[in-house]
Amino acid sequence: NDVQYVMNCAAYTAVDKAEEHEDLCMRINRDAVRNLGEAAHAVGAKVIHVSTDYVFDGTSCRPYLESDATCPVSVYGRTKLAGEQALMEVCPDSVIIRTAWLYSEYGNNFMKTVLRLGKERDELRFIFDQVGTPTYAGDLAVAMLAVLERAEAGKFIPGIYHFSDEGVC
């Protein structure tokens, strides 16, 4: 077997649409993750899985710690937490990396929308009921590679880790 690691960045991430498509969201964010974990475990591979801060209720005045109790308030958050739990159940030798406000020049994300609207409109209005740290996808990729490098050095430590860039907006 040549497979040592599986990196899973796939997910149903349309947070608002998830409320209307709970079954599909659960099949992707929980069931597919469980299947991936089972397949990886069967061949002795370790899984590095990307998750989200939506597993929390978002009411903390400080950054969440890995040891904080989860309490998702949305379908998306509940399905991502269910995926974490399913993965650790079938493939406990896994790393889960929770991140927040992920953005890049690719795909759909809040930062790209703001930049596009900034070009189209003279004025932008925002609700300001959330505080968070935007995380560049490239930085998350570097963090995931660091997990692989540690694993190759014999220092793979399964568990849940939080990663985001610095700063707050």
Where are these regions (language model features)?
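Conserved catalytic-site loops of classical short-chain dehydrogenases/reductases
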Residues: 5-7, 45-51, 95
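Mid/C-terminal beta-alpha module of Rossmann-like enzyme folds, strongest
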Residues: 143, 150-169
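Catalytic helix-loop patch of NAD(P)-dependent Rossmann-fold dehydrogenases
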Residues: 20, 27-35, 46, 55-97, ...
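NAD(P)-dependent short-chain dehydrogenase/reductase
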Residues: 85-132, 137-146
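Conserved sequence/active-site signature of Rossmann-fold short-chain dehydrogenase/reductase
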Residues: 55, 102, 131, 166-168
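Short, intrinsically disordered, charge-balanced linker/junction segments flanking boundaries
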Residues: 1-2, 115, 166-169
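NAD(P)H-binding glycine-rich loop region in Rossmannoid oxidoreductase-like domains
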Residues: 1-30, 41
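Active-site loop/turn elements of alpha/beta-hydrolase fold enzymes
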Residues: 11, 52, 99
